[in-house]
């Protein structure tokens, strides 16, 4: 097992199933929308697998981490490239003023409410990554309906993608 995990691309790469190439070529690698889509796709596939295998609790943290990260990247994609950090409230606070007058008020409220839900359960972007990062004061039990979270996140990320496209 001494073979490296990250290798030069093989000549027969198109024939290998599941192969991935990371091609930075001196650039960032993937655009923010591509990263957002990759994490959304990963979350959706995990949701589908969890539902199909009835492995709900085992898949919960990876699913929510992927969705939370897709949300963060979606917010960043709609903001100037100089905006950094992992704080959803800060990212939302930077984006929201520019939406007023361009996006229906009820949609702005809906976006803010969904973002606030993630902030409530994962204020430091760590709750779904580490076993010991549960924020104090969090509800002891919360229910996540996988069908609902998949549909809601698809809508949320679509709206943010449209906002990002309109910003350009």
Spans of features found by a protein language model:
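Domain-scale activation on soluble regions of proteins
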Residues: 1-168
């Amino acid at each position: 097992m001494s073979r490296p995990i990250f290798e030069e691309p093989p000549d027969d790469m198109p024939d290998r199933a599941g192969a991935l190439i990371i091609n930075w070529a001196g650039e960032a690698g993937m655009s923010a929308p591509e990263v957002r889509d990759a994490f959304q796709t990963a979350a959706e596939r995990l949701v589908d697998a969890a539902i199909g295998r009835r492995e709900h609790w085992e898949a919960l943290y990876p699913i929510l981490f992927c969705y939370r990260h897709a949300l963060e990247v979606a917010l960043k994609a709609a903001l100037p490239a100089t905006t950094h950090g992992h704080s959803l409230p800060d990212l939302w606070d930077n984006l929201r003023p520019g939406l007023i007058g361009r996006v229906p008020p009820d949609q702005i409220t809906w976006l803010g409410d969904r973002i606030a839900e993630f902030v409530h359960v994962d204020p430091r972007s760590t709750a779904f990554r580490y076993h010991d990062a549960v924020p104090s004061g969090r509800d002891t039990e919360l229910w996540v309906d996988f069908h609902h979270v998949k549909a809601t996140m698809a809508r949320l990320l679509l709206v943010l993608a449209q906002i990002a496209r309109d910003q350009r």
